């Protein structure tokens, strides 16, 4: 099968983060913007098209594992001696992110800026409280923003993954 599907696991800054709701990661980027260039001498259309904004790649998701440890791993803040979470002033953190898919591929975001948008889903008997996350794919120092690793390839090494069971 050639389709990429199913959210298996999300690693952010080298650590597995907790559950994402059943909607998984949803595209939230913007399309590139082009400007047409017209010449007075050419009457039937533009002579060129210039990309004025390259757009951006982004995803959104709802984090439903709101354990103190998970919140610290995902958007920062601190955990005190009693296990309470104190949020940071800015609800954001930037680090590599790996999306492991049920189909076997791993999608690496080399420089993912994760921002806590706001709480989602409410506190009620119909669902669980979540933290809405926005994930922007920024370029790293080598100019890379993402790469899709084939089934069985370790994103850390780029080589076939070693099976620990032999």
Regions found by a protein language model. Name each.
Residues 106-166:
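Mixed-charge, glycine-accented linear interaction segment located at domain edges/termini
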Residues 80-97, 152-166:
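Short, cationic low-complexity segments
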Residues 86-120:
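Acidic-leaning, charged glycine-interspersed low-complexity segments
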Residues 1-71, 113-130:
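Solvent-exposed edge beta-strands and adjacent loop segments
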